[in-house]
From Swiss-Prot:
Record-given protein name: Pleckstrin homology domain-containing family H member 3
Any Pfam family matching the protein: RA_2
Positions of the PH domain: 95-199
GO cellular component, one term: cytoskeleton
Gene Ontology biological process terms from the UniProt entry: signal transduction
Every MyTH4 domain range: 237-399
InterPro entries, sorted: Actin_motor_Myosin (IPR051724), Band_41_domain (IPR019749), FERM/acyl-CoA-bd_prot_sf (IPR014352), FERM_2 (IPR035963), FERM_central (IPR019748), FERM_domain (IPR000299), MyTH4_dom (IPR000857), MyTH4_dom_sf (IPR038185)
Organism: Rattus norvegicus (Rat)
Phylogenetic classification of the source organism: Eukaryota, Metazoa, Chordata, Craniata, Vertebrata
Composition bias, Basic residues: 594-605
Modified residues (Omega-N-methylarginine): R636
Alphabetical list of CDD domains matching this protein: FERM_B-lobe, PH3_MyoX-like
Amino acid sequence: MPLPGGLWWLLCCRRGFTLLHRDYGDGELSGDGDEDEDDETFELRSPSPAGGGRGSLDVTLTQPTRNGPITDRLQSWEETWSLIPDKGLPEDDPDVIVKGWLYREPRGGGARPWLLPRRAWFVLTRDSLDQFSSSGKGARRLGSLVLTSLCSVTGPERRPKETGLWSVTVSGRKHSIRLCSPRQAEAERWGVALREVIASKAPLETPTQLLLRDIQESGGDPEAVALIYRRNPILRHTSSALYAPLLPLPYEVSAPGPGYAPLREEAVRLFLALQALEGARRPGPLMQGVLQTCRDLPALQDELFLQLAKQTSGPAGPPGLPATQDPAALRYWQLLTCMSCTFRPGGAVRGHLLGHLERTEQALPDSELAEYARFIRKALGRTRGRELVPSLAEISALSRRQELLCTVHCPGAGACPVSIDSHTTAGEVARELVGRLGLARSRNAFALYEQRGAQERALAGGTLVADVLTSLTSEEVGLEDSPDSGWRLCLRLHGPLHPEGLSPEGHELPFLFEQAHALLLRGRPPPPDDTLRALAALRLQSLHRDFSPRGPLPLLDRLMPPPAPPREQPSRPARRPPPSAALLAGALWSPGLAKRRAERARRIGTGRSTESTAQVGGGGGGSTTAAVLGGWKRLRGMGQAEAMAAYLALAAQCPGFGAARYDVLELSTEPGGGAPQKLCLGLGAKAMSLSRPGESEPIHSVSYGHVAACQLIGPHTLALRVGDSQLLLQSPQVEEIMELVNAYLANPSPERPCSSSGPPSQDLSDTSPPSQHQVLEKPQGQSGCLRQLQD
């Protein structure tokens, strides 16, 4: 008959205590449980209370007595506590930091409604957290938790559905203790004290860290390094499971994130995932999952670097590496390549990894593994951290040590393919395209933009293009059925437009011409009607040369932006001025300018809404077509380059040309200034403005000449210094805003009112007579022509 499981466990523990008797006393502990154990004593050395001498403190190891025929052998937990010496009264211990009565959860985990928490006397010292049955002398010890630098504390938190008490959880290597108190202040006091004790502990080092130090110290001796690898299997490739992490990770009970286990358990799971790579039919998704885990749990990044260094060392250590012809043997190197292009290892791990790569290159200089080692070393020197893990396409390219192909659309030049890697920035791509198009000496600045339908966003110069491609690809997969799911990268004008001195033979003139047209079609606010008709005539002249009655009539929707639908403005109560009103009032931020713009926009909007109504009715749409065609006829003889230059000069005078809008939060600079206010920041060619969401008219505006400085003061906070005052704005796009504002500040332009006429387009002054708005509602015999345009 087999022995019960509990009895086997008891015998093993008893044998273990017998073998380790030297750690607990000087006497010989017998394994038979005779009466000699009841008289066993040993001496603890402690400072003498009198002077600096050392006295002795006798501690007796007592065994509980039992009556009846049952065995006198101790239960496991009783024998464990019998080997822990009693320190005497907690009040007499000078190392006590905090003590008091607290509730503790019963054994077996969380509290249950039918089992109430029990009170215990807790004592916190600089080495452990002990609990006793009472606060008096000779109290029985109920438990103890040794505190190290890896212990963690969570809370205080309240659990109304369980105990209704405030709890603080202390996690150790084997178990955790949850301290409960009905008062939040007391729970916070214990939490702070526990964290201070843990923070004061010296960092623990794992055996792997000690071996890494030995390898670093003997790095110049290959034989010594090889000997360390041969004697320590923890550093070599293995097909067995890993039961503990290689680096010291904190003990935790709660998961660090949704869907994850505690860190130490996740480290073991990562090693299992690495071993699964050898037989995976599609290793790409598995690699991406491992990278995403390290992205969500940064504490595991160095752990994974060490695990990969272990698995790429070969079963016998360097230079005994696995066969390079086996595809499964290369997958560890491929994942290490992806890791080196995504994360930056820590100091000690980085040094060990670089040494491991160097030894691999020296052992097999002409092998494929040496090529991977050289690629990884270069990547480690350039990697600065990624916002997103590589996509499947990037993982496939990195596994072959190849570059990615990125397509950038350039107005007037088509699609330009650009080769990038995991470290290429948007600024580098923009500079390469500017050099290709011959725009290096241009006065205009250009940048890379992310465009999706009618929405576009400037990319900061330091943005990694690989991260942008990954985010756009993932969003496109999630929006397959959306009409705006199409996206692309484009090179665009970034900052003020300088149309002067453009060469008719270069690429810059058609590049800016096509871009200006695309910007005007999405302009906010749209230019006046007379300017739109003049621009449409100039575009027709540049595309089709002189007007011909036999040619097809152009479509207005490709020449002019669609009219905005009429919107009624409901009556609103008077608002309290925003915090920026007092800051930016007077000469810097002019409310009078906003009023004039609002009145002008009201007149323009009324005229355009009337025209839109007339076009819907079918009576007055021909007036716009007739005006555009009339202006086109008067441009007979103008060359293509001349028409493009006139188009750019006229477009540059429009206040809404190239304007960018950003959603920002305005922060008050005064203490107690109130909650942040949601506003829209508009950056135009001549000035910047602040407006409320949903409104096209600004509440305040200021020219760039009054902006003294623009700088970052936080991760998402931008400071604009206007005169002697400061404006604080928060936005996730602060880097783009700062680059655009600094581009405008570096290229000041004289303030001038917007006009539909200018030196390059003086012959267009008759294309839109002043009485045009009065005759829009009257049919002018062009309904057939308009019908032909719509067809």
